[in-house]
């Protein structure tokens, strides 16, 4: 199944709820089949991660599970590996999709991203990223000259 693609802007309400675009909801709501019924299961859970670039990253359970498997390989007895695990889980939260297609973001998550009223949601293949609109535009304009060299180097 194709990844998340596209960009939409939505308002965050006074309770910190953000509407997930319908085209993205369709993608992550259809997970593996329910073992009991054989029907496609619906998983309204998303993992929210505070990224270093000031955005929030949203992961569906199957994608986060792959990352978690990598973390499980790290040793609690290795100080660097233990630190990394602690730092990742300290930046992670879990939220659920409500019946209106919204997720509730904690004040801590909103503050990290600088989101007050509006947010831009970008489909970024296996994840979605959530940005404060001006912060995103500043990042894109400040780095516009880097696009072609980066694209030529990595894709």
Swiss-Prot record:
A Pfam short name: MraZ
Keyword Transit peptide among record annotations: no
PROSITE patterns linked to this entry: SPOVT_ABRB
Leader sequence residues: none
InterPro entries listed in its UniProt record: MraZ, MraZ_C, MraZ_dom, MraZ_N, MraZ_sf, SpoVT-AbrB_dom, SpoVT-AbrB_sf
Principal subcellular localisation of the protein: cytoplasm
Recorded GO CC terms: cytoplasm; nucleoid
Keywords of the record: Cytoplasm, DNA-binding, Repeat, Transcription, Transcription regulation
Highest taxon of the lineage: Bacteria
Domain SpoVT-AbrB span(s) in chain numbering: 7-63, 92-135
UniProt-annotated location(s): Cytoplasm, Nucleoid
Family statement drawn from the similarity comment of this UniProt entry: Belongs to the MraZ family.
Oligomeric and partner information: Forms oligomers.
Protein's name according to its UniProt entry: Transcriptional regulator MraZ
Species whose genome carries this gene: Chlorobaculum tepidum (strain ATCC 49652 / DSM 12025 / NBRC 103806 / TLS)
């Amino acid at each position: 199944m194709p990844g998340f693609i596209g960009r939409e802007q939505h308002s965050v309400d006074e309770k910190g709820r953000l509407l997930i675009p319908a085209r993205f909801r369709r993608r992550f709501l259809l997970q593996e089949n329910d073992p009991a019924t054989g029907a496609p299961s619906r998983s309204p859970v998303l993992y929210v991660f505070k990224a270093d670039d000031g955005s929030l990253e949203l992961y569906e359970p199957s994608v986060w599970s792959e990352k978690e498997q990598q973390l499980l390989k790290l040793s609690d007895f290795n100080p660097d590996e233990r630190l990394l695990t602690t730092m990742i889980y300290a930046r992670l939260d879990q939220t659920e999709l409500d019946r209106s297609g919204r997720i509730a973001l904690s004040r801590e998550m909103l503050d990290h991203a600088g989101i007050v009223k509006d947010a831009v949601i970008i489909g970024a293949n296996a994840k979605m990223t959530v940005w404060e609109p001006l912060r995103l535009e500043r990042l894109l304009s400040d780095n516009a000259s880097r696009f072609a060299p980066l694209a030529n180097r990595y894709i």
